[in-house]
Amino acid sequence: MSKLTHIDDQGRARMVDVSEKPATAREAVAAGFVRMSAETLALAISGSGRKGDVRAVAELAGVMAAKKTSDLIPLCHPLALSKVEVAVEPADGGLSVTARVKTTGPTGVEMEALTAASVACLTIYDMLKAAEKGMVIEAVRLLEKTGGKSGDWKADQP
């Protein structure tokens, strides 16, 4: 098993020193899913929910969240993100969220992509909870990452 990079030899949490790492192109894609009834999905698609356009607001929330990742995850580095794209699309049984994040820097953007997808899912739940409290947020995961010392990685399909 690989050594955990955020734990020092004494078992204490630490922020990884990336000052000697070269700036390279990095990209990560994460996804999530909010399972809901057909009635709630129709409400989300129509854009006529009480709080407004669910998909547009969730996409914006995901973008904002990616930019705030280092404020939320204690050992994440603050990064200058060059692109954040969040898409919320209707799917069988709910809304599918995909977040794509890019940077050129010394560390990857996996956490930013995961944070964007997670917060977009939470925003969907918040905006539709008046219609259905039993929605389920599921399958939040990293789909792929490119760049960096560890190279490219892609998740096995579902």
UniProtKB/Swiss-Prot annotation:
Subunit structure: Homohexamer; trimer of dimers.
InterPro entries, A to Z: MoaC, MoaC_bact/euk, MoaC_sf, MoCo_biosynth_MoaA/MoaC, Mopterin_CF_biosynth-C_dom
UniProt-recorded name of the protein: Cyclic pyranopterin monophosphate synthase
One BP annotation, GO: Mo-molybdopterin cofactor biosynthetic process
Entry's EC annotation: 4.6.1.17
NCBIfam families named among the record's database cross-references: moaC, PRK09364.1
Residues of the active site: 126
Pfam family name, one: MoaC
Signal peptide feature range: none
Function: Catalyzes the conversion of (8S)-3',8-cyclo-7,8-dihydroguanosine 5'-triphosphate to cyclic pyranopterin monophosphate (cPMP).
Family: Belongs to the MoaC family.
Enzymatic class: lyase
Taxonomy, superkingdom: Bacteria
CDD domains in the cross-refs: MoaC_PE
Keyword Lyase in annotation: yes
Entry GO MF terms: cyclic pyranopterin monophosphate synthase activity
Residue sites binding substrate per the record: 75-77, 111-112
Alphabetical UniProt keywords: Lyase, Molybdenum cofactor biosynthesis
Catalytic reaction equation(s): (8S)-3',8-cyclo-7,8-dihydroguanosine 5'-triphosphate = cyclic pyranopterin phosphate + diphosphate
Pathway note: Cofactor biosynthesis; molybdopterin biosynthesis
